[in-house]
């Protein structure tokens, strides 16, 4: 039959190799570093969108329960303890933060302009904007500015 190569051997093609000592790593490997950093940045933004989306959904659920079933401080505190006992590595579910999730949802849920923007901005930035600004115009301006900063960080590879 012919010579066969084990799948675990000779994974790289047989070529005349460049002496690694003669390489300029900064020049040769920089494109690979760019690929890695861009992927990391995209992953971070995707995780952030999902996290903010989760906070939105939790806020919507809590808001509905407060209105329909008169959930109050005690029930929200019980939920906070319950979820942290089941997911001990998950942060961000203190009673105070759960109320912020409700406020976050109620602040933006009626706005077609603002609700898509909040997912492009980190949770801390959303809380600052929501807590310090009254008008929708000001919120929109700073949400857009914060979203551009996130994109700029991504372009820089940070």
Model-predicted regions and their roles:
Residues 1-158:
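Basic, low-complexity intrinsically disordered segments
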């Amino acid at each position: 039959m012919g010579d066969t190569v084990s799948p675990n051997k000779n994974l790289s093609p047989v070529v005349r190799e460049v002496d690694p000592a003669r390489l300029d790593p900064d020049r040769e490997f920089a494109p690979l570093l760019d690929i890695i950093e861009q992927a990391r940045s995209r992953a971070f933004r995707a995780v952030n969108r999902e996290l903010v989306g989760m906070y939105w959904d939790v806020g919507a659920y809590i808001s509905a329960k407060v209105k329909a079933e008169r959930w109050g401080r005690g029930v929200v505190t019980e939920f906070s303890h319950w979820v942290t006992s089941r997911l001990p590595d998950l942060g961000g579910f203190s009673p105070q933060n759960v109320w912020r999730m409700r406020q976050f949802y109620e602040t933006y849920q009626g706005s077609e302009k603002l609700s898509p923007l909040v997912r492009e901005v980190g949770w801390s930035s959303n809380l600052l904007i929501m807590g310090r600004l009254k008008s929708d115009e000001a919120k929109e301006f700073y949400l857009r500015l914060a979203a551009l900063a996130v994109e700029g960080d991504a372009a820089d590879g940070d």
